[in-house]
Amino acid sequence: MKRTNIAGTSPCEPVIGFSRAVRIGNVVHVSGTGPAGAEELSAAEQTRVVLGLIEKALRQAGARFEDVVRTRMFIAHAEDWEEIGRAHGEVFGVIRPAATMVVAALLNAKWRVEIEAEAVVAD
């Protein structure tokens, strides 16, 4: 099965040893994506920035939002759940992937959200 690594712009990628996304066959895994450079924005705005980065990685892997079957949202503050959830719903409200939202300490203390995504591209 063919493997394609999709590089992002994070300086952490070579240090930690990860790719923004990896496509194996028709499955695309997008790494945890944070709002780098958007730390001062609201939780909803950070979520929109993150989803834009995820969309770019999906496109580079030959996928679209419509192919996403699962997302995982890691949020820094429980009180942000609805704001983040609504921004997630702006993209996925009709698509309705399986989703998880967990409160967690994030790598950057100013990040309010980090999101992972998995997509399956139709043959």
Predicted features by range, described:
Residues 1-69, 75-123:
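N-terminal presequence-like segments and the immediate start of the first folded domain
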